[in-house]
Swiss-Prot record:
Subunit structure: Binds to the WW domain of YAP1, WWP1 and WWP2. Interacts with NEDD4. Interacts with ESR1 and UBE3A.
Free-text note on domains in this protein's UniProt record: The PPxY motif 1 mediates interaction with NEDD4. The PPxY motif 2 is required for the coactivation function.
Protein name: WW domain-binding protein 2
Gene Ontology, cellular component aspect: chromatin; cytoplasm; nucleus
Keywords noted in UniProt: Cytoplasm, Nucleus, Phosphoprotein, Repeat
Length: 262
């Protein structure tokens, strides 16, 4: 746990270039107790913003308080609990130890009160990230930022509570591979094989047009007219035409003899 080592002159929070801000909440109050020799910076109630990174919790106070920033790494925190009192805002409490060169000594009990809400969400995320960090896992959404010459990155104060946005000009980290899955590999045994097209017969030959036939004779025309006149058409069966059977020609006509000649 370090004192006044994670803030900038412009009011932003400073983290290492291998960290990222996972979550932040404004309108948070921080108090300490159970300290033998209470330094001046630990007295009273601190008001500001709390940040969650993959490896620690950082509190950034507002105003001209002697405690400008306060950092608590997970490996120095214990007995963390989320409390929901009947009266008052929800809060997170626990114990933290000082680290070597952190600006103070000993241990202290802390209390983070979320006056505008968010204690349950922040506490659940903090416990999950701390558990992953203890196993050496990289928490979800924890992407490192490009190398900075100073070895740190300055985040401006957040606009609103919730997830902290990426800094301006920094390309958003690529989504995990399972976020935009590509098309599944097709099994060869299940693939659909289109049959080949039928053989092409080639261009069709133009129809053969016979030459002009001989003009019909008057006798043929008369015979056709006679057949058409004697044909029978049935409307119920329009595809068939009934024609009478061929009969022998009638006998020759003889004019009656003149009675006078008889």
């Amino acid at each position: 746990m370090a004192l006044n080592k994670n803030h900038s002159e412009g009011g932003g929070v400073i983290v290492n270039n291998t960290e990222s801000i996972l979550m932040s909440y404004d309108h948070v109050e921080l108090t300490f107790n159970d300290m033998k020799n209470v330094p001046e910076a630990f007295k009273g109630t601190k008001k500001g913003t709390v940040y969650l990174t993959p490896y620690r919790v950082i509190f950034l106070s507002k105003g001209k308080d002697a405690m400008r920033s306060f950092m608590m790494p997970f490996y120095l925190m214990k007995d963390c609990e989320v409390k929901q009192p009947v009266f008052g805002a929800n809060f997170i409490k626990g114990t933290v130890k000082a680290e070597a060169g952190g600006g103070w000594e000993g241990s202290a009990s802390y209390k983070l009160t979320f006056t505008a809400g968010g204690a349950i969400e922040f506490g659940q995320q903090m416990l999950q990230v701390a558990s992953q960090a203890s196993r050496g896992e990289v928490p979800n959404g924890a992407y490192g930022y490009p190398y900075m010459p100073s070895g740190a990155y300055v985040f401006p104060p957040p606009v609103a509570n919730g997830m902290y946005p990426c800094p301006p000009g920094y390309p958003y980290p690529p989504p995990p591979p399972e976020f935009y899955p590509g098309p599944p590999m097709m099994d060869g045994a299940m693939g659909y094989v289109q049959p080949p097209p039928p053989p092409y017969p080639g261009p069709m030959e133009p129809p053969v047009v016979s030459g002009p036939s001989a003009p019909p004779t008057p006798a043929a025309e008369a015979k056709a007219a006679e057949a058409a006149a004697s044909a029978y058409y049935n409307p119920g069966n329009p595809h068939n035409v009934y024609m009478p059977t061929s009969q022998p020609p009638p006998p020759p006509y003889y004019p009656p003899e003149d009675k006078k000649t008889q």
